[in-house]
Amino acid sequence: MSFDYKKEYKEFYLPPQKPQLLEVPPMNYVAVRGHGDPNAQDGEYQAAIGMLYAVAFTIKMSYKGTHQIPGYFEYVVPPLEGLWWQEGQSRVDYAHKETFSWIAMIRLPEFVTKQEFDWAVAEAAARKKLDLSKVEYFTYDEGLCVQCMHLGNYDTEPATLNAMEQFAAERHYKIDCTSARLHHEIYLSDPRRTAPEKCKTVIREPVCKVE
């Protein structure tokens, strides 16, 4: 049976609909950085997602080819994730999506070294005739966070974020978004196939102790 990160690491991918604190270890990702409204048709974000999956599935299916990755095991490609911020804003402003900066990313299995990653990018670029020059091997060290499962439309996330901030404050923590630790979302539902009110999104915010 294929290894499924969502099932094996439920604390990171299947949290309750109530906020919780947790320590998130460093993880490696295939990532693309960009700017602008993620909903823009044929926009930068949609192109980035195509790049991510091209590399992710090249790695996943590599065992069927001549290039054998040491330590490979069959696995389910982890869900799409995103880091989001806006210049001059301490919190995400959903009313002005055109000002978003983002890092779209998919978690990599532990056996994917930088060398194997570079092979996969070159292989995907050649096979699919894509420009993958924006794709990068990205290590994200998230640390202590407040996390919650958000159920519903992305535009209703502020209510969940308010609950997370209140939960943290009651425990003498504050939201601590910086250039190194950002608003983080993990997308468990495909919005093209799921009713908006049923979409599941894991939301994380970095926190630190109030001095």
What are these regions (language model features)?
Residues M1-E211:
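A solvent-exposed interaction/effector surface
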